[in-house]
Structures are given as C-alpha cells and as structure tokens.
Amino acid sequence: MNQTRVFLIFAWLMVAALLWMEWGKDKAAANAPTPIASQAVPAARDPDAAAPAANVPSAQAIPQAGSPAAVPATSTTTATPATTGAAPAITLTSDVLRLKLDGRSVLDAELLQFPQTKDGTEPVKLLTEDAAHPYNATSGWASERSPVPGVGGFRAEQPGTTFELAKGQNTLVVPFVWNGPNGVSIRRIFTLQRGSYAISIKDEVINKSDAAWNGYVFRKLSRVPTILSRGMTNPDSFSFNGATWYSPQEGYERRAFKDYMDDGGLNRQITGGWVALLQHHFFTAWIPQKDQASLYVLAQDGPRDVAELRGPAFTVAPGQSASTEARLWVGPKLVSLLAKEDVKGLDRVVDYSRFSIMAIIGQGLFWVLSHLHSFLHNWGWAIIGLVVLLRLALYPLSAAQYKSGAKMRRFQPRLAQLKERYGDDRQKYQQATMELFKKEKINPMGGCLPLLIQMPIFFALYWVLVESVELRQAPWLGWIQDLTARDPYFILPVLNIAIMWATQKLTPTPGMDPMQAKMMQFMPLVFGVMMAFMPAGLVLYWVVNGGLGLLIQWWMIRQHGEKPSKIIQANAK
C-alpha cells in the first residue's frame, strides 16, 4: 500500500469519525425521549425523599464517649420545638468558590477562578437557581416514623448571612442545626478548604428523647439539562453530558442525559463509590464515606434528571448519637486537584473516552503534556513539545511505513507486467502477485500497520486537547489568546492547507487512478475548511504534526535515493 493510499485512509477515517459524531448528535436530538415522572414510592416525611427506609443500607449508631450521659446538657443543639418558616439563604465564600445555600441545598455555586468568557469578569456558575435550567445539590434526611428537617429546617448557628474565608486562614467552618421535637437534633457542619472545590458536609444526629430515632440521609444532584447548540466545531456539544458513577466492584460507568432512563433507575447498593453529573470541563459529585453503603439511584422528576445516594440508615437510641459525612465536589476537572482527593476512580470524570484503553492512553498523554507545561509554562508550547516527542517516538514506524512504500514503488513495473500478462484473470494475477511479494519479502500491509498503531494515539490526543480544562482560555502567543477558541484570523488553518498541499506534492503516486487523484486534490481544502472553526489548540497540533511529517517525508525521500524535485514534477503531470 503506497503513501497516498495510507494518507487517504487516515484522512477519510478522520472525516468519517467527525461526521459520525455529528450524525449521532442529530439522531439523538431527534429521538430524545420525553421526560417522564419518577416512579411512585411510599411516602416519607421529607418531600424530597423517594424511597422507603427498608430499601436503604443501614449503619450502626455510634455512641458518643460510650454512654448516654456523655451528651452534654449545655450543647448548642439542646432540643427545642421544631423550627418553622424558611431559613434565610447563607453565602459562603472561599478563594475559589462562592456558594449560596439554605443549610440543606446548595442553590448557587460560582467558580471564582473560571470566568465565563476570556475577557469577562462573570465567573462560571455551575449550580444555579435559573428558572429554565435549575441545577442544585441537596442533602437531607428522611424517615417514615420519626421527625426530620424539611425545606428550610436547618438554621445557621452563627448570626449573619455571609461567611468568608479570611486571609491567613485555610479553613472556613460554618455549622447549621435543626432542632426537632422531643429532644432530637441534627447538627450539620459545612467545611471549605483553601484552594479546594470539595465541600465537606458532616451530619450528627443527637437523640436526647426517650425513644429511638430512625431515619436515613439522602444526597442528590438534580438538573434540567441545557440544550447545547450542535455542530462539530462546538466541543461542548459532543463532550459527554450526563451521570457517572463508580463502584469498586463494577468500576466506572456512565449514562448520558439523552438516554437517562433507558436502562432503568440503577438501584444498586454500593460501598466506597461516588456519583457525579458531568459536562464539558466541569462537574458536581457526591462522595460519601468509604465505609458507609448507599443505594445509588437515577431518576427523573419532571424535566429534572436526578442522581441520588440514599443511606446509610440509622437507628439512634435515646441518649446516643450517630454521624455521617460526605464531600460535595463543585468545580472543574482539574487533574492535579482530583488526585489530592484520593478517591478511587474519580480521575475518570476527565472523560477522554468511555473505553478504558483509550482513557489510559489519554491519561498518559496528558501526563506528558502537563510535565512539559511545568517546564515551558505555556500550553501552546507544551502542545508543540508533545507533538515533537510523539513524532520522535513514532519515527521508527514512519520509517518502516515509507520503506515499505518505497519498496512497493520499485516493483510497480513488475506488477504492471503481471497485470498485463494475466489480463482479466484476477485469481491468477493475485496468486502471481503474492508469489512476488513472498520472493522479494514485501509486506503489502507494511504501510498500513504503522497507521493503525498511530491512530489510537492521535484520537486520544484529540480528546485530551478537547477535554482538558487546564487549556481552557489558555493563550499561546500573539493572535492566539485562547487555545480552546478558533483562530480569529484563520492563520493556522491556512498554514495547515499549505502543509497538506506540500505533503501531497511530495507523495509519490505511481499508478494512481484518476478518482484518487481528484480526491487528493480536494483533501487539503476539505481539511482546511473543517479546521477553520476548530479550537486553535487542535489546529496547532495538526500544523506542527503536519510540518514535522513534511520534513520527515523530505528526509525519507533523500535517504532512499529518490529526488524530491522529480516526485514534484511527476505529480504535476
């Protein structure tokens, strides 16, 4: 297989992959199911609870200091009549987050270090009370028999409605409390750490009544998905949007919003896992205690898609207490910060691919890219450095590919003679051809195998550049001030066309039929138009990769005793 056919295969595979993704989005939009209401369940005292306690994993009640008397009589959570009326909204601000919450639900969440636009000042709002597309995180308690806090039940223990992480402090702690009837109270503590998007939420149930208290905690994420503008030039539209979850037994799984209830409501008991809602560059997740089991549920509540953890359930004896803790992640898919959370499988939210092998390749490529960035301090130069390293690593394959093509070209006259000799007898022609290949030790697939080996790397790198939030709004130099936006002056796409055209002229084309020749003439223009509206980081990759490929092509031609000028003249005929 000559260089031209290899190039054509690679080019058309790329076009086919992009067209397939575009067709898949259009088909999904046309066939999107109408949201349905969640299934009926036994009533619970909490309006947001959706399952009977019998279906929820239990946890052992944990006594304080070993005896009922250990619960201090002067605690700030001394039993009082149940609180009535809606609690005022509280604002918590750290160096990276601004949260609006009511003690039970996080209603708004702004990511202070991520502006919505390159030149804007408005931060990305991940959780929102927007009437058209609400998106919030809720943690509450439910019970079939015992009193529990409802909407507005939690109250801040400290006066005021605004709490901010002060300079010199690394931790912001804001406690809330619900005082129920008959001496039962739940104390909830929100903890924000400097530089972290993980919010710790710890609940302690204290029972000072004379009867056992029964209930379970639930934690959920719910949103009305945003309808994204479709198009192969819009990475948001073909990045994964939906629910993901992880269990030590089953590993990482996911379900897109458009297919949310196709496989049922999940209803799986998991210990040591997590659940998340993903979108391009950002996500939210509930990460419960590793040693406490929860029932994982996917559901729809009208237009809302819901991912929920139910449990553990507690039976708290009189004079005893029980506690449970979880982390709520509200933030970007920053690989360095995800690693600090020490949560198994959480790195998969950076969705390089749903296939494990491609995800592993993508993680490896990003590891190299991030280390290059630590030295070069610029993501554009890091992309160029990565392409250079890949080209060096794949040079033996490129050399083998060209060597195979050169050998095939030398035997083109003999193949033409065989074709003339056997005429329309294809069986004899193929038999004679295979005997010639065997005698001369020619591998007809020698030019194709290197391509097949390189393709997973190239596709994985594409998703690394699209999915990595680290590159979001990152500049390169001069006119490229955002590697995730298109080239404003189309300089890189034009360079890409020129490099592809020059590569085409340097590619020997013995025996090419007229149809292939016409396809080759239009290929640089097709790719140029396609790349014109792609993110500049991707086009930069193609320009550098193509430029290095052109230099390698020139070098290979001279190494095998051929003259570039003769090839150019032959292709001009």
UniProtKB/Swiss-Prot annotation:
Main location: membrane
One Gene Ontology molecular-function label: membrane insertase activity
Coiled coil ranges: none
CC terms in the record's Gene Ontology section: plasma membrane
Localization (cell): Cell inner membrane
Membrane topology: Multi-pass membrane protein
Transmembrane portions of the chain: 6-26, 355-375, 379-399, 446-466, 488-508, 524-544
Biological processes annotated in GO: protein insertion into membrane; protein transport
Keyword Repressor: no
Presence of keyword rRNA-binding: no
Keywords: Cell inner membrane, Cell membrane, Chaperone, Membrane, Protein transport, Transmembrane, Transmembrane helix, Transport
The family this protein is said to belong to: Belongs to the OXA1/ALB3/YidC family. Type 1 subfamily.
Described function: Required for the insertion and/or proper folding and/or complex formation of integral membrane proteins into the membrane. Involved in integration of membrane proteins that insert both dependently and independently of the Sec translocase complex, as well as at least some lipoproteins. Aids folding of multispanning membrane proteins.
UniProt-listed HAMAP family: YidC_type1
Assembly, per entry: Interacts with the Sec translocase complex via SecD. Specifically interacts with transmembrane segments of nascent integral membrane proteins during membrane integration.
Protein name stated in the entry: Membrane protein insertase YidC
Organism of this sequence: Xanthomonas campestris pv. campestris (strain ATCC 33913 / DSM 3586 / NCPPB 528 / LMG 568 / P 25)
Biological classification of the source: Bacteria, Pseudomonadati, Pseudomonadota, Gammaproteobacteria, Lysobacterales
Gene this protein is translated from: yidC
